[in-house]
């Protein structure tokens, strides 16, 4: 087979979520080396390293001929690479190989959840162009959330049960388990304002969160638009329905208790200040400014057969 690319760089963290990262590296390099004349394997020892390597690739200090990037890891590792590519304006395609708890965006790209299978899919995958979310000076592929979803992310980081991933089994006990905090919000979306009290606000680019599909048929990370959802205190009974369903459905069936507002530019303030979950990483607090950057990033995509 003819090599598609001159020089690929495969990034990974030692604590990627795979039980044996070195074995995992070996399993994916067979396929990746078949499409790259030269494949560099780059360990990221500390948070922020991948962003530094992206800067070196941009300035040609890393190598002069890098023309594709691969990442083996979970959503947090992928998020770091997205930030590196966007911050340093690297116009290079990215191949994502799942290696963590959740890889929500790989589902959007039709990539297999197993890293070895995913690497084999890279051989025939095509480059697709996708929107990116900008949050203050950070970037994300999939979602921005606060309230209940932050509490969930903190549970996962502590090694506790992943509430969102297990919602289908929890049902009506969600409210008791989580004891969610109400907060006041002021939201501006494309110059229209909204305010009130809520337990969770979610702005989504991709259709999968926590391993399940958001039941909104036309939600796409290629439409130049973001989708914001405001949950009210009566929403708990249908949270289960939303995250349990595996297929898209008519939003009108579950619209009670959830307000859905599409838009491109969003400003959000809360009282009190709230932590913000960006693709599973909690790194900001409100107030935040959010906008969609259309056609911002190139990702290897498996054709949906």
Swiss-Prot record:
Annotated ATP binding sites: 44, 74-80, 101
Binding, Mg(2+): 220, 223, 225
Record has Methyltransferase as a keyword: no
Domain DAGKc: 3-139
Parts of the chain that traverse the membrane: none
PROSITE patterns listed in its UniProt record: DAGK
Gene3D superfamilies: 2.60.200.40, Probable inorganic polyphosphate/atp-NAD kinase, domain 1 (3.40.50.10330)
Functional summary from the UniProt entry: May catalyze the ATP-dependent phosphorylation of lipids other than diacylglycerol (DAG).
PANTHER family per UniProt: LIPID KINASE YEGS (PTHR12358:SF106), SPHINGOSINE KINASE (PTHR12358)
Protein name: Putative lipid kinase NWMN_0695
Source organism: Staphylococcus aureus (strain Newman)
